[in-house]
Amino acid sequence: MKKLVLFIMILCLVLLVGCGLQDEAPTTQAITTTTEEVTAMNTDLGYEQISGAQAKNIMDTESDYVIIDARTTEEFNEGHIEGAILIPEYEITERAEAEIPQKDQLILVYCRSGRRSKIAAEALVDLGYTNVKEFGGIIDWEYDIVRS
């Protein structure tokens, strides 16, 4: 009887120790996204999301582009990027074709924080524009602005 009790106790001890051990602690899998993957995701939307620095580089090196400020008139008058034309996000569908007749024109779009510029960029793509780049908001713009 003592041998049976001792055997059961050893068996329970082995089971408890075996269940309590893990080879390694749980880990969190890191999510990495390459620039190419981000670009592919953005081009699925029909437009490309770029940084302010990339937009500034285009402005410095290219000559044939249009900058759209998708904010309100009041915001535009407080300060805007030089050369930008004001087409508030809610007026894009009515005014874009008159302001920008070429559908393959390079268009750079921004707003205050990036929300309205994304909406405007999507609307431009829906209108058939094929070379739209959205670069977020003027609050992140590290370069000169024109104050009216």
Predicted regions and their residues:
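Rhodanese-like catalytic fold shared by cysteine-dependent sulfurtransferases
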Residues: L4-I8, L15-A53, I58, Y65, ...
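Short, polar loop motifs at secondary-structure junctions
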Residues: A70-E75
